[in-house]
Amino acid sequence: MARQVSLKDTRNIGIMAHIDAGKTTVTERILYYSGKIHKIGDTHDGAAQMDWMVQEQERGITITSAATTCFWKGNRINIIDTPGHVDFTVEVERSLRVLDGSVALFDAKSGVEPQSETVWRQADKYGVPRICFINKMDATGADYFMSVDTIRERLRANAVPIEIPIGAEDKFVGVVDLITMKANIYKNELGTEFTVEEIPSDLVEVAEKYRAELLENIAEHDEELMEKYLEGEELTEEEIKRAIRTATIANAMNPVLCGSAYKNKGVQPLLDAIVDYMPAPIDVPDIKGVDPQTDEPTTRKSSDEEPFAALAFKIATDPYVGKLAFTRVYSGTVESGSYVYNSTKGKRERIGRILMMHANKREEIDKAYAGDIVAIIGLKDTTTGDTLCDMDSEVILENMEFPDPVISVAIEPKTKASQEKMGIALAKLAEEDPTFRTYTDEETGDTIISGMGELHLEIIVDRLLREFKVEANIGNPQVAYRESITQAAEAQGKYVKQSGGRGQYGDCTLRVEPLDNPEESNGIEFVNAIVGGAIPKEYIPSVQAGAEEAAQTGILGGYPMLDMKITLLDGSYHDVDSSEMAYKIAGSMGFRAAVAKAKPILLEPAMKVEITTPDEYLGDVMGDVSSRRGKIDGMNPKNGVHVLDAFIPLAEMFGYATDLRSKTQGRATYSMQFDHYEQVPNSISEEVIGKKNNK
């Protein structure tokens, strides 16, 4: 099958937003107007096309980013729908990694909300160009200009309106296009018909002010336009659009549009803006990678002629076809039935079938081209973040980084017969989601599942029941504690066993000390400071392995140890009896003895929590933060509400959603994410260790 749409007419975009800004509704309307759906589905009644998991339809939130293809004015738009709940930030990171541009949605009543900031920062990290769409202009309290101000203030973004609304709340009837300086007035309920009219007289002055601001902004990024603008010449529509496109792709500005997706107003201009201002795959820098043979950096151009390279950014299990690998093709082409190389795993894979996804409907194609986002069936060893490439032109594209889980619960099947089934199901879910882990606690024999928050684990348990028919009970949440030390200490580890026949002999002296700046480390550093061969070279890795293994179970409560440096200072050996095993045991003994002298402490995860509360509940909310051992880091009043930034230990956050709702009659919201580890106060530390050791 020949390429249907050229690369320059392809757009890979995401839609990112806070949990309730109307993201799924906007996607629905885009699919409706671009002719993919004949009846509009609504999140309000649980029938949206993109929210295809049952849990999503019940909760009215989007959990997995479904990939959808649609066409608009001869362009192909691939849309990745991303979740807005903070427990699912991994899905957002994952989709931003494979997008070329994004539409950031905001709720016109509240402007920037906590999760909008998190998602915006993630998009900054990947340098994704964005246009802003201020949705829900028909809602009570909608305020377009306030929303634009919050984008500028809280996100420090150069948000520049290219439309302004005509009316607001129930009087919202259309928009003024600042490029053409005409008014688009919507005539029918479905928003498919609108008339282009002169700007209403009461809006002319405001429109002229914002148009001048737009022209000044784009002139800054285009010398030719700057000259014309300063000389008072009229700029053509084409020139303005070209300049907006250049500035947007360079991340120098964010065009702002508005509408009400629910009331079908403003969606077609948004589609036009996606085509006009979002980059095609050829407009973004070449994808970076590493040549696995030489470890040298390399790049791949977005072109069908280049060797094949693609990134599997999401694995999903489909009830009918099994494992789907959602994949972004960066360069080259790939055909169904062909063999490719998974360079991350070093394994050959066969491409079974290639599907173009439309929410949960699918169309089979026989070939995928550069710039396409497709689902591949038949990959056995491929997991999230793996690179697929040509056998004879290897590359590993930069991998994605995923945060470690912060909350764990014990889980057991309701019937013993389901034990094996549960194990298989959990393994499948862990394959789909790198922030979800499952393991067996060796001391208690319990199966433990870990994730990014209570909602994340609730949904996992839900999916066990629905997709795998496994009923499970879960225990109380457990916090991922860690241990560390507060001072330097030295100790000897000596393992000698000589009772006839070949004995064992390992002897080492280790120093442990806290790291100066733990933020830059990955937990534990090992340094060999032995000179003069006190321990033969071949045994040093064994000492390191013994010490690092011992660091996995600290001496206070058996939690993994963090933020410390281990130095091998000295040792001795025996010509006959020394062995790798003996040095491994000696390394472990020396480490534990040194840690015992180094004033060990317990660490707990501290969460960065952002709480948005109406002013009248501020005192109660602050008091509650203090009672949870929280520290308030900043306060930001805005329009009758206060936004509090706080650091609160995760151990104190269980059930917080319910408490906050009852304290504020459901009017406050919060979001949290892991920030750092900090020392647990002594009284609590003793209680935690006591509980752990009495198990």
From Swiss-Prot:
Assigned GO CC terms: cytoplasm
Disulfide bridge partners, by residue number: none
Residues that coordinate or bind GTP: 17-24, 81-85, 135-138
Region Disordered, residue ranges: 285-304
GO biological-process terms attached to the record: ribosome disassembly
The keyword Nucleotide-binding appears for this protein: yes
Entry keyword set: Cytoplasm, Elongation factor, GTP-binding, Nucleotide-binding, Protein biosynthesis
Entry annotated with the keyword DNA damage: no
One annotated GO molecular function: GTPase activity
Compartments, record wording: Cytoplasm
Function according to Swiss-Prot or TrEMBL: Catalyzes the GTP-dependent ribosomal translocation step during translation elongation. During this step, the ribosome changes from the pre-translocational (PRE) to the post-translocational (POST) state as the newly formed A-site-bound peptidyl-tRNA and P-site-bound deacylated tRNA move to the P and E sites, respectively. Catalyzes the coordinated movement of the two tRNA molecules, the mRNA and conformational changes in the ribosome.
Protein family per UniProt: Belongs to the TRAFAC class translation factor GTPase superfamily. Classic translation factor GTPase family. EF-G/EF-2 subfamily.
UniProt-recorded name of the protein: Elongation factor G
